[in-house]
């Protein structure tokens, strides 16, 4: 199993191992082998699961149930490997449902709270992917995940903070979750990440704040009081920030301006959103830019005037012609 684990780090080998029946053998070892065999088998399955077809095959061989059990009850090394495997497997929609059905959310939240360093990051990563589904967002919150993820975003390693910010971003697409994140002190943590974090952390935090403001308008007061306007405004103009990072901060500011008559999204924000209309869709950001612009145009007369001034009408007319 240890040899297969190493071989499975190569793309061609992943295909060959699966073709030779290796998935079934490794799942069997992960379930019934010695402690060392289980560890190596789970490590091999984690590497194999990078391949989409292998990910499906692992689930078909009942590997998800085995991996959830090891993530819950295994040795520290087994838990580490199992968390990584579940993170890779969760990229598949059917696997997401199977992980949840096997009790994976409770196990992953527990690992994110109590695990060792690598376990926490992998568990938070798996939760981030699972949280792309609204039912799963609700289940993660019900399992106590919000408090756990806020703690990781505040006190974790850089990798843990990045994964936690991404998970909070997805969880915040749900109204009740956004309210819960705010109540648990998440706004302050997210603003701190948007100000001082890595590129990935800043982007995840800015999107999380934007989602909260959009779906739970009552959270905007907390963002303003915690200094979020200055932090997000700075991020839209930060020299070292990526275009995407600037864009998500701009979207958050537009949503904020739509909820507070005394706030206005700067022309820089609107220009960032308008520039996205000329680019191909990627990750939904073009759609989100359009939605934010339309919301701004109808939120107040002052916002509508600004929207006209920076060319919003012409840009959306061009977009309408393109999609007609």
Range-by-range predicted roles:
Residues 25-27, 45, 66-68, 107-109, ...:
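Buried hydrophobic core positions in alpha-solenoid tandem helical repeats
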Residues 29-31, 70-73, 111-113, 152-154, ...:
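Short loop/turn motifs that cap or connect beta-strands within the blades
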Residues 220:
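Solvent-exposed, well-ordered loop and adjacent helix/strand elements within mature globular domains
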Residues 1-9, 16-20, 33-50, 60, ...:
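Alpha-helical solenoid repeats of the armadillo/HEAT superfamily
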